[in-house]
């Protein structure tokens, strides 16, 4: 939240250089405040788990949020009841004439398919195109980030020989970017994917800025012009047990799945997971909401 200080206070310039949100008394006395409209396009099969993960993070700020859950009309969800979707979700057709302060596009377990082979790709393209003029900032996660990078900037994805699965160390590539305010130079984030985007492809697109990278996991955070589009290739929203649940699910199916790296204590799946990404996960979402949604969105959408 902003700090209200005198516009002539010498510390004001120092704080502004550090991306601390300061506000003059004059602006504070005249500003209009309303709840931020946030849409979550939930592409995950485990919809209720994903709801809790994302709402936990975006709810951990002083901002008042009006959240709208969206699902794909062109896809039949098999892991959630129709009653749940009817009660709590809308489709794009329901909201296409509205504007939103923020949009979150989640990951989806379809990464081994070409984008054009995904049954809801055409609908997703309409939503991503809509976001360019009707949403102040869009946060794309995992496959949602790959889809956004491909649709908006033509960045391809590549198959991995082995699943990128575990918790990995990342390094901040750009200092003094608002999305990374408060980040340590090295931080952890979970990854769970069979495909990747590559650093060279990101750097070849002049509109994109690579913010965080990992020697082992590759590209993690990318941002577009003015923060209108943010891409997170990892899963900073994951709860403590998520990787464990994914590991046990695939193991019980008889799939050849490795133990998630750097996750269980002593790398032993019989021991408890060690959470090393929670603080930076909270920072990522709060910075996105604060700097790229709250501070940038108009009062009248």
Swiss-Prot record:
Organism field: Bacillus cereus (strain ATCC 14579 / DSM 31 / CCUG 7414 / JCM 2152 / NBRC 15305 / NCIMB 9373 / NCTC 2599 / NRRL B-3711)
Catalytic activity, as annotated: L-homoserine + acetyl-CoA = O-acetyl-L-homoserine + CoA
Protein name, UniProt field: Homoserine O-acetyltransferase
Annotated family: Belongs to the MetA family.
Primary location group: cytoplasm
Site entry: Important for substrate specificity: 192
EC identifiers of the protein: 2.3.1.31
Coiled-coil parts of chain: none
Record-annotated site: Important for acyl-CoA specificity: 111
